[in-house]
Amino acid sequence: KGLDVLEEPLAQHPDMAKLHPQSVNTMRIVTDRVGDTVHIAYIVLKIGRGDGFCDNSGQGGVICRVDEKTGKICSVATDDYFNVYETHPDTGIRFEGYQLPMVQEAVDFARKAALVVPQICHVGWDVAVTPDGPVLIEGNDYPGTDLCQLAPHYPEKQGLWPYYKEILNIK
């Protein structure tokens, strides 16, 4: 339709680029705002594959869980076809235990962003990490909770139920 978007190129942090240099690999940090309190539902890392420049699992990428406290990847990766990867198929980097840069800064950034639009309480913030810090790529008002809850991501087989039970005060 003749509509184009021209954006400044983004250079990701070298530790993010090691995972897959062709794509800008982002953390999806899902926030839930209850009153004035912002909760972190989950964090997944989206990583590209092959020659693709997109990190989205729907475009061939993979996702894995990130531990908010340690900033490390805390699961294997999965794709949209339920395949499980212990290492990145292109770079060979082992997912579980990989230390991501500036996770706490990215979480703080997402918490602040969640307070900007109070009408939207559940948002998935796609945050890239550059050498200078976190950068917002986009906010998604329907971030999806399906792929992030696959059994390889939650070996205790409870998914996000304990989290939502707690923040929504469900007995």
Say what each PLM segment does.
Residues 9-11, 17, 41, 77, ...:
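A sequence-composition feature that detects small, non-aromatic residues
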Residues 1-77:
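Phosphate-binding site of ATP-dependent enzymes
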Residues 22-24, 105, 122:
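Short, well-structured alpha-helical interface segments that form or flank functional binding sites
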Residues 83-105, 111, 115-120, 129-171:
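C-terminal active-site "lid" helix and adjoining low-complexity regulatory extension at the edge
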Residues 66-68, 78-89:
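Solvent-exposed helix/loop surface patches that form functional interfaces
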